[in-house]
């Protein structure tokens, strides 16, 4: 559906603001993050944009700008934080009557950038906004219709996506709760990959050093290639499953009207017979 946006990540963080929509009226925004006793920072973004960069010894910060078509709307765009146990909940609030970035000629949004020390986990709750995460130890992303890109995540990435897009590169392990009508692309997974359900969207995995398990594929597509372990799939409905270059075994338990294509399987192949 969407092409990968990872080449954009190689640009400076400020480039994210250069590509922003119109910004007739603006104000700076910042928040001094209180990380005392915190293991995870939860960013509740809604329709806003965020870049998170984690590195050793980094000073925690959150800054950016609020943009609006009406100057009076700027006061409705605020940042808040609240501690709950060992989590810090950071919210990009929009106390306005329209929910999206644009409604006709009206718009209101924030573009934000955060730095975190590299021992703090990151959790994202994204509506129609977009987020990029680089260097976090563990990442969790719940995405609606927005976009998330992440790279250099040392540990587990847990993700779910509705109609949006998730693009991952160089991660420790992968757990996908569900893919609705959107896309999830993962490259260079250094551990096991577990996928729950794929609806009408697409799942692409290119390079995995562990085992891969997909529970179910509906009318969507799954493409898996270059896996050092085993690949097992519970069921395929009317969608397509393409498996190439697997050093271990391939197993498909149930297949409906969809298609299965496989090649380069070193181990055993156990799939339903064609009727």
For every predicted segment, state its role.
Residues 238-255:
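Short cationic/low-complexity microdomains
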Residues 18-126, 132-143, 149-161, 165-178, ...:
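Acidic (Asp/Glu) and glycine-rich low-complexity loops/linkers
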Residues 207-208, 213-216, 221-235, 242-245:
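Intrinsically disordered, low-complexity segments enriched in Gly and acidic/Ser/Thr residues
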Residues 4-14:
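Sec-dependent N-terminal signal peptides
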């Amino acid at each position: 559906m969407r092409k990968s946006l990872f080449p954009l990540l190689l640009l400076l963080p400020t480039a994210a603001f250069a590509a922003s929509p119109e910004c007739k009226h603006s104000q700076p925004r910042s928040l001094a993050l209180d990380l005392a006793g915190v293991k995870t920072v939860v960013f509740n973004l809604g329709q806003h944009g965020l870049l998170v960069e984690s590195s050793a010894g980094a000073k925690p910060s959150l800054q950016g700008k609020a943009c609006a078509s009406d100057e009076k709307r700027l006061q409705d765009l605020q940042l808040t934080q609240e501690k709950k146990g060992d989590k810090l909940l950071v919210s990009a609030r929009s106390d306005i009557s329209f929910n999206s970035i644009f409604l006709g000629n009206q718009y209101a949004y924030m573009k934000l950038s955060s730095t975190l020390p590299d021992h703090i986990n990151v959790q994202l709750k994204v509506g129609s906004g977009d987020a990029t995460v680089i260097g976090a130890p563990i990442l969790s992303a719940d995405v609606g219709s927005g976009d998330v890109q992440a790279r250099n995540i040392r540990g587990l990435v847990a993700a779910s996506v509705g109609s949006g897009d998730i693009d991952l590169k160089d991660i420790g392990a992968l757990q996908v709760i569900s893919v609705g009508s959107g896309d999830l692309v993962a490259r260079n997974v250094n551990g096991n990959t577990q996928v729950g359900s794929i609806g009408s969207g697409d799942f692409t995995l290119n390079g995995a050093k562990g085992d891969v398990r997909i529970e179910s594929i509906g009318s969507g597509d799954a493409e898996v290639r270059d896996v050092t372990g085993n690949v097992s799939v519970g069921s395929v409905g009317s969608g397509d499953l393409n498996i190439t270059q697997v050093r271990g075994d391939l197993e498909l338990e149930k297949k409906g009207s969809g298609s299965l294509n496989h090649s380069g399987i070193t181990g055993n192949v156990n799939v339903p017979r064609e009727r």
